[in-house]
Amino acid sequence: MFFCKATKGYTRTTVAEIVKEADVSISTFQNVFRTKDGVLVELVKFMFGSQFDMAGQIAGQKLPPVYVYAVETSIQLALTELNENLRDIYLEAYSHTEASEYIYQHTSSELYRIFGPYLPSYTESDFYELEIGSAGMMRGYMSRPCDKYFTLEKKLARFLSMSLNAYAVPAAEQKQVLDFIAKLDIRAIAVQVMQELFKALAMRFSFPLPDSVKA
């Protein structure tokens, strides 16, 4: 059922399709998830619960935590450029009341850990308020597909510059972070993350993978 949403998109996936793919009854589905929105919330919890871990593996342990943030947000933006169905899911996640609240709560804890040294007087509650703004920026950039004028590279640099400014990262350090991201093959990384995500979802929620994802 989760693969159906990830490969077809949120708005085009019906409850009937989810139930059929999951091979469960309507009553069982309603007891577990209540509605299609319940599936979205569970999907968001799973995806956002592991995104920082994936980014940490790519950035490595030797780099400051701000690099993990830059990699994680860059992967999100790259994923939405590679797969329109993932764009649909991410946009819905950042708009849906319960799903977006989970994102704010989960991400604000990470932001407090990462950017607390830059804003020592800020509490985790302050970072929650900042996350509402940065999540709005993320959704805005996700909703605008890249083209030959507004490339993915420009999108990443613009988003990171705005968000790192909001979190009081010094200009010299910002440049180092942006240079690091520019040297990554972020598209290839996003493809790898997408494949690993689908495989992890298959293991977590017990659905078969098509050959295109197994490869």
What annotation goes with each model-predicted range?
Residues 9-10, 52, 56-60, 88, ...:
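Short, flexible helix-adjacent loops and helix caps
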Residues 15, 43-52:
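Short, basic, alpha-helical segments at the C-terminal edge of helix-turn-helix-like DNA-binding modules
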Residues 143, 147-215:
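C-terminal peripheral helix-coil segments that are non-catalytic and often amphipathic
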Residues 4, 8-38, 42:
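Helix-turn-helix
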Residues 42, 53-88, 94-96, 104-109:
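Hydrophobic alpha-helical connector segments
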Residues 3-7, 50, 54, 79, ...:
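Solvent-exposed, amphipathic alpha-helical segments
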Residues 92-146, 150, 154-161:
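Amphipathic alpha-helical packing segments from all-alpha helical-bundle domains
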Residues 87-92, 172-176:
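Short, hydrophobic secondary-structure boundary micro-motifs
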